[in-house]
């Protein structure tokens, strides 16, 4: 059984980390992509917002409280271009994510004796509420890493002709 209080605290701390990595950047850095098919910092933040609102919280709710019902379909990869993430305002995007994260934390705190073993039968297999909960936190960690990688790559590109190699291997 997942320790809900620990997960809530880590999700709160990750919101702080995401804020530190996404706030007060130049517009150029917010929208910069290391390659044409990579995501920018701004796209990551908007992805986190939509995943918070339309994926994880929604799916945990469906598994716990609406057995047998199908959650609305999602298209996280497609949303990046369809919803023009990289054209949005960086500050407003971060603030929107933080509002959704606060709503998620409040919602999670309000759960009373959730059945983390409740199952959803997806076309690819069984998914439990607990699987979704821990994946939600893991998803944060993946994108905190991605935001750090984007900062590193941006610095390396902007620093030319100087090199970041002395810092150590990435």
Walk through the language-model features, giving the residues of each.
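Solvent-exposed interaction patches of small proteins and small membrane subunits
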Residues: 2, 6-9, 32-33, 65, ...
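Generic structural signal for well-ordered, non-transmembrane alpha-helical segments
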Residues: 12, 16, 50, 54, ...
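Short, contiguous alpha-helical
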Residues: 31-76, 119-170
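Surface-exposed helix-capping loop/turn segments at secondary-structure junctions
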Residues: 23-30, 109-117, 153-156
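Short amphipathic alpha-helical segments at helix-loop
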Residues: 3, 41, 82-89, 124-128
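Acidic/histidine-rich alpha-helical segments that form the ligand environment
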Residues: 14, 78-117, 131-136, 146
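Alpha-helical bundle segments that constitute or directly flank the non-heme di-iron/ferroxidase center
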Residues: 1-29, 51-62
């Amino acid at each position: 059984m997942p320790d809900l209080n620990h997960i809530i605290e880590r999700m709160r701390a990750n919101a702080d980390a995401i804020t530190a990595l996404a706030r007060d950047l130049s517009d150029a850095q917010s929208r910069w992509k290391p390659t044409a098919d990579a995501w920018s910092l701004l796209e990551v933040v908007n992805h986190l917002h939509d995943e918070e609102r339309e994926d994880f919280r929604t799916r945990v709710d469906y598994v716990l409280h609406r057995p047998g019902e199908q959650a609305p379909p999602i298209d996280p990869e497609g949303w990046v271009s369809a919803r023009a993430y990289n054209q949005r305002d960086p500050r407003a995007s971060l603030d929107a994510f933080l509002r959704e994260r606060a709503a998620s934390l409040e919602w999670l705190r309000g759960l009373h004796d959730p059945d983390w073993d409740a199952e959803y039968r997806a076309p690819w297999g069984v998914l439990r509420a607990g699987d979704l909960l821990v994946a939600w936190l893991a998803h944060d960690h993946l994108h905190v890493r991605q935001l750090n990688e984007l900062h590193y790559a941006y610095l390396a590109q902007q620093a030319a002709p100087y090199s970041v190699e002395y810092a150590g291997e990435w």
